Amino acid sequence: MISKGPAGWRIFLFNIFDHAPQLIKDFTWPEHLMKGFVKKYPMLFTGGASSVTHMHFDIDLSHILHTQFGGRKRVLMFPFEEQHKLYRKPFEVLSLADFSHYYETNGSPDYKQFPALKLANGFDFILEPGDTLFMPAGYWHHMEYLDSGFAMSLRALHPTLSGKLKGAWNLFGLRTIDTVMKKTMPKWWYENKKKRIFENAE
């Protein structure tokens, strides 16, 4: 952990239990809250102050319990239905807009380039050490480390068959198409996607 000064580095989706399996005894799975936890993959997230997780939603459409252990984190979240107002990239789970330091006067995003962002309805809050955030499947989230800190995410598969199938399609269909097109027709694919992004936001 970095204890002095801002550092934009972070480690994400790190399975700490592969390296220290004894830690699995230090917590219990909250199965009284929801079922379907992917117990093989509890993930650790660490970052220095000022590091950023850019606006996205999790590709597998899992429900997530995100517990902050150390440091504070600023979070911006939106329901999945706000995707076009957030300028979602087609065939991806990312936003074209940059939300870095959105809470500062001179921060992003660029509302002139992305005017529909002003119409998106979401949540803006700070996670303190000891807080646990529930993120429903498909929720968009952008996170900024206000301090050096670390957190852990527990994932639970979508409870419905349609949700599981959509998650599988995102992983193995959507992503494959995007990868192939980026390799075979990169310029055309980029321009086509960019055009669709702004058309969808209108």
List the model feature ranges, each with a label.
Residues 1-132, 142-202:
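N-terminal accessory scaffold of Fe(II)-dependent oxygenases
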